[in-house]
């Protein structure tokens, strides 16, 4: 795709070697490499990749007939005219199969290719995180030559033997519900910028509970462990597997707890008791400063549970300002948490009171009780 993510979750170049945006982050310009080729499963070069391929791919995603609505939500919300074009193709029915990227451009969708190696997207609103959006598969390129060769139905149903590649590997073999094997793409544009496996096989494990057995027998080199496997290993300091545990690559999502300020009962009437209680600041702070989520975090990251801690609506790394400052670090300053470094032991919000919320609890019961709340 245009961009990718490094092992720390930060956006890095891929087919786009550089990119920039205007002052209000509504116009994003991507400068593409000029050494990217499409090749088939045998490594034979089939076509040269240019900005046109991204237009073709984007039209495919937004075309209701061709793409059948897969992965349309993100571009529909972040690119001018994208949602309208999707609706247009939906109204066209089967006739949308003949529509091309030129129809998309004529319809006013906010994407253009000024030359073979420049791509410009226009957002309906400021979108400072658009580079992370552009790394998503909704923005992948597609070869017009391959679509013409296979036809719309054939392209939609293509497999590893008929698809074209531009990434670091070619798929050598795919056995349904068993394995898929990869070999280096001899035409990979960044071959001299990375290290690749000579041969790599991904084994599909239907039951993760047997994953550890496969690892111990040497059938696989790495696996995701079940929670019970992890508990068994980490609870025994002499277990040899402790030396080989490692954290997984961070992912771009977050979970939050949302409190309902207008709860209704089973009859549809406002639950005044709860609504008055939750409106009380001390009541809410009991949740914020009292809940110890370390054990819950450990279900995702047993090695460093507090690496999962997030005091913000968005996850770290989603967007940066024009000075290169990461968004959540700016929010941390506003919350007074910017001096609270990761310590691996205590949640940031619990450090000031060591989890003791007895005074807060007293306040959270006295104040609502004074206005008729019962506990």
Can you annotate each of these PLM segments?
Residues 70-74, 300-314:
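Short, glycine/acidic-rich hinge or "gate" loops at secondary-structure transitions
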Residues 37-39, 127-130, 307:
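Primarily extracytoplasmic ectodomains and periplasmic/lumenal surface modules that are beta-strand-rich
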Residues 1-23, 164-165:
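N-terminal lobe/hinge region of extracytoplasmic solute-binding protein
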Residues 19, 108-110:
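Beta-strand-rich interaction surfaces with strong enrichment in secreted/lumenal proteins
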Residues 93-98, 105-108, 115-117, 122-201:
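Gly/Pro-rich hinge or "lid" segments in bacterial periplasmic/extracellular proteins
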Residues 7, 33-64, 168-300, 318-375:
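Extracytoplasmic/periplasmic ligand-capture domains
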Residues 22-25, 113-118:
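A short, structured loop/turn motif at beta-sheet edges
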